[in-house]
Amino acid sequence: MAHETTSGRRLPDPTSPSDPTRRTAAIRIPFPARLNPHAERARQHTLQWVQETGLLTGDEATAEYDTLRLERLMAYFYPDASAGDLELAADFNAWFFIFDDQFDGGLGTRPHEIRGVVDALVGTMTTDGAPRPADVRDTPLVRAFRDIWLRSTAGAPYAWRLRFRDHWQAYLAAHVGEAHHRNADRLPSLEQFLEVRRHSIGVQPCLDFTERCGGYALPDELYRSFPLREMREITGDVVIFVNDIVSLVKELAAGDINNSVVIEREHKGCTLEESVEHITALANARTARFARLAASLPGTLADLGVPAPSREHVSHYVDGMRHVMAGNLSWSLATSRYDETGIAAVSGGRRRPWDGLTTATGTASPRHPRRA
């Protein structure tokens, strides 16, 4: 049996017994995953925050959200973060996934409407730390994003705030590009897909937060240097490929084609299992390249005369990339988002209970911007 996307494209059967999405044993991420000991505190904090901001309403929606254990993804990403920083990261991650789920239905194929959503969110990202006046027409998504933006940038160096803003703008704008991919008569090539997905995966803002948790901001010339630039791209690609393998059945059930496994199957004319093997090989080649770059980096920095404190910050930053790759895999295999429960939640036209937030206004808002 085949399934259709919202644009009528035929997709493979997501209920096939030869399910390739759990075949992650061949993925080689040679970095250990560690869990932050403050994970449960972050969970309790964020459950309260998503209700205060109006992102979730009602016990049923909150219970369904809680089964995803999204705070654990951040606890893997930032295993050494303070309790306050982890709470803020968990809030951002809650917003990220709730926002992502808005595009599982018809909105995901309407780029002009998405542009309006993006513009409203971009307008909240002031770099001077001054909050934009609230608008009575603001949605819970906008109000919640404003809250976490202000908390994240409070006291941060100006150059870091600019990078953080640029990465979030690119993340938001990429949803317009993904809508165009869904509407196109032909699937994009893998490279065309990655040009957009490298932004919509949201890894770059997460790596910015690695700096924040470490209490430093890399100088621009060091941040943009060749080794770190390529290592960031590798980190994002590995997260993309792992996500696409693990979430394949869920995305087929929802009718979404923005998945590297689906794209490679279409262009190579192979089976889903063969496509999974190919994407796995791409991920493994990238982690091997990352390891080689990381091994040569200390000597490169010393030869360039980079001061010792900056070298320590780079070491922390590189560890942060390792945490993101390893933590994403560990969390993805444990969350209910991609198991049978998560697949059923988006099958047969069903949407998550937090769908529709791009137009809902509501009245809930945080009592005050928390500082972390």
UniProtKB/Swiss-Prot annotation:
<feature type="binding site">
    <location>
        <position position="104"/>
    </location>
    <ligand>
        <name>Mg(2+) 1</name>
    </ligand>
</feature>
<feature type="region of interest" description="Disordered">
    <location>
        <begin position="349"/>
        <end position="372"/>
    </location>
</feature>
<dbReference type="InterPro" id="IPR008949">
    <property type="entry name" value="Isoprenoid_synthase_dom_sf"/>
</dbReference>
<keyword id="KW-0456">Lyase</keyword>
<feature type="binding site">
    <location>
        <position position="251"/>
    </location>
    <ligand>
        <name>Mg(2+) 3</name>
    </ligand>
</feature>
<feature type="binding site">
    <location>
        <position position="250"/>
    </location>
    <ligand>
        <name>substrate</name>
    </ligand>
</feature>
<feature type="binding site">
    <location>
        <position position="104"/>
    </location>
    <ligand>
        <name>Mg(2+) 2</name>
    </ligand>
</feature>
<feature type="short sequence motif" description="DDXXD motif">
    <location>
        <begin position="100"/>
        <end position="104"/>
    </location>
</feature>
<dbReference type="GO" id="GO:0046872">
    <property type="term" value="F:metal ion binding"/>
</dbReference>
<protein>
    <recommendedName>
        <fullName>Pristinol synthase</fullName>
        <ecNumber>4.2.3.182</ecNumber>
    </recommendedName>
</protein>
<feature type="binding site">
    <location>
        <position position="197"/>
    </location>
    <ligand>
        <name>substrate</name>
    </ligand>
</feature>
<feature type="binding site">
    <location>
        <begin position="337"/>
        <end position="338"/>
    </location>
    <ligand>
        <name>substrate</name>
    </ligand>
</feature>
<keyword id="KW-0460">Magnesium</keyword>
<comment type="function">
    <text>Catalyzes the conversion of (2E,6E)-farnesyl diphosphate (FPP) to yield a new 5-8 bicyclic (pristinane) sesquiterpenol (+)-(2S,3R,9R)-pristinol via a 1,11-cyclization, which requires the abstraction of the pyrophosphate from FPP to yield the humulyl cation. The only accepted substrate is farnesyl diphosphate (FPP).</text>
</comment>
<feature type="binding site">
    <location>
        <position position="100"/>
    </location>
    <ligand>
        <name>Mg(2+) 1</name>
    </ligand>
</feature>
<dbReference type="InterPro" id="IPR048128">
    <property type="entry name" value="Isoafr/prist_syn"/>
</dbReference>
<comment type="similarity">
    <text>Belongs to the terpene synthase family.</text>
</comment>
<dbReference type="InterPro" id="IPR034686">
    <property type="entry name" value="Terpene_cyclase-like_2"/>
</dbReference>
<comment type="pathway">
    <text>Secondary metabolite biosynthesis; terpenoid biosynthesis.</text>
</comment>
<dbReference type="GO" id="GO:0016114">
    <property type="term" value="P:terpenoid biosynthetic process"/>
</dbReference>
<keyword id="KW-0479">Metal-binding</keyword>
<dbReference type="Pfam" id="PF19086">
    <property type="entry name" value="Terpene_syn_C_2"/>
</dbReference>
<dbReference type="GO" id="GO:0010333">
    <property type="term" value="F:terpene synthase activity"/>
</dbReference>
<feature type="region of interest" description="Disordered">
    <location>
        <begin position="1"/>
        <end position="23"/>
    </location>
</feature>
<feature type="binding site">
    <location>
        <position position="247"/>
    </location>
    <ligand>
        <name>Mg(2+) 3</name>
    </ligand>
</feature>
<feature type="binding site">
    <location>
        <position position="243"/>
    </location>
    <ligand>
        <name>Mg(2+) 3</name>
    </ligand>
</feature>
<feature type="compositionally biased region" description="Basic and acidic residues">
    <location>
        <begin position="1"/>
        <end position="12"/>
    </location>
</feature>
